Amino acid sequence: MSQGKVVQCIGAVVDVEFPRDQMPKVYDALILDEDSPTVEAGLTLEVQQQLGDGVVRTIAMGSSDGLSRGMKVKNTGSQIQVPVGHGTLGRIMDVLGRPIDEAGPIEADEKRSIHQKAPTFEELSPSVDLLETGIKVIDLVCPFAKGGKVGLFGGAGVGKTVNMMELINNIAKQHSGLSVFAGVGERTREGNDFYHEMKDSNVLDKVGMVFGQMNEPPGNRLRVALTGLTMAERFRDEGRDILFFVDNIYRYTLAGTEVSALLGRMPSAVGYQPTLAEEMGRLQERITSTKVGSITSIQAVYVPADDLTDPSPATTFLHLDSTVVLSRDIAALGIYPAVDPLDSTSRQLDPQIVGEEHYSVARAVQSTLQRYKELRDIIAILGMDELSPEDKLAVARARKIQRFLSQPFHVAEVFTGAPGKYVPLKDTIKGFKAIVNGEYDHLPEQAFYMVGSIEEAVEKAKTLN
């Protein structure tokens, strides 16, 4: 185990000098080998570049405050290793797999490197089974595949985390399997809320949690998604169906941008790292299902300035099976979840996978909403009276559909006061089919707002008259 010393420290970037014949390899973990009152004990550094003459450039996984030149560093000779297996369930860990929940050491019989190869093409096993979420708009227009990858896209404050929490609530509780949650560069409060949500629902013993919050240095935030993924991969390789939640994948990209700039690489479009596509691909290619087990991944993706063409969300799009796009315009109407049914897509929305009825109802809903969108300018200028009878009917139905796409969430009960609703897929299809076919043209549109099934809308209409 070779020993070196710190020769330069610029923020999170630390240069370490070793004897020339004992230079660490790229991605080797180095540990600060001396006690100092000013610096975190056992600070881990990950080698990013070999500069030559025995000097390597590393990124600190913790705060580098108090580091000084000449401090001793030892090479562990291996990459960052984290505990995996059943000992991680019900525990909260940091990027290095250390417990941060004050519940004692993690009893794991195996450790794995966070840098693993993606499964080969022969090992992959695509799935066409649907994963019911109980959220009407998602199940109807952008259904999830079991073992697929889903992205929740949205700008600031349109409800990505609330939607993610509801999906965890509906799927993790219904699905008796195991889940891994990676909190990448998000608020500490949200991690705390998630922990208590899981504890109150008695599913904590089926969830492993890894957090690298927004107050952590960029090296930490860049690697925490890999730590969570390594834990999920171990469960998959045991032959299990795993849920892997990431909040937020954009912060992973942002941490990569910070690290890239610190390492002196030339930035590319909009200041992102030149290796953006490669870094994203390396992470996403590992989140996949094999013939042994599956990983179903749900990832929140922050969209900077609501611009879906920004390089970060645009690069993420390529890897996903379903994209759930949250719209500020829909949120402004008070319709939650604020999912845009015209912008959201799914590869599963195919008559051969979801069935002819589901497919035709979803397309009828989208075409009705599209017609309303086209007529909105005419209505704004000339008013409803100038429309033809067919268009008036289309607008009335579209407004009912729009309101029926809203739904009270279990996780939002605290601040809405309305009990949450889980709507089975068959009830969702039945309700929207009836609205599109004009069976509820006589009901007021307010009856369809914030209800679960269509029967609830009918009951609500009775109270409005």
From Swiss-Prot:
Job of this protein: Produces ATP from ADP in the presence of a proton gradient across the membrane. The catalytic sites are hosted primarily by the beta subunits.
Q: What is its EC number?
A: 7.1.2.2
> Its membrane topology, per UniProt?
Peripheral membrane protein
Q: Which UniProt keywords apply?
A: ATP synthesis, ATP-binding, Cell inner membrane, Cell membrane, CF(1), Hydrogen ion transport, Ion transport, Membrane, Nucleotide-binding, Translocase, Transport
Q: Which organism is it from?
A: Methylobacillus flagellatus (strain ATCC 51484 / DSM 6875 / VKM B-1610 / KT)
Q: Does the keyword Membrane apply?
A: yes
Uppermost EC category: translocase
Entry's family note: Belongs to the ATPase alpha/beta chains family.
The GO terms this record gives for MF are: ATP binding; ATP hydrolysis activity; proton-transporting ATP synthase activity, rotational mechanism
Catalysis: reaction(s):
ATP + H2O + 4 H(+)(in) = ADP + phosphate + 5 H(+)(out)
Give the Gene3D superfamilies listed for this entry: 2.40.10.170, Bovine Mitochondrial F1-atpase, Atp Synthase Beta Chain, Chain D, domain 3 (1.10.1140.10), P-loop containing nucleotide triphosphate hydrolases (3.40.50.300)
PANTHER family for this protein = ATP SYNTHASE, ATP SYNTHASE SUBUNIT BETA, MITOCHONDRIAL
Q: In its UniProt entry, what is this protein called?
A: ATP synthase subunit beta
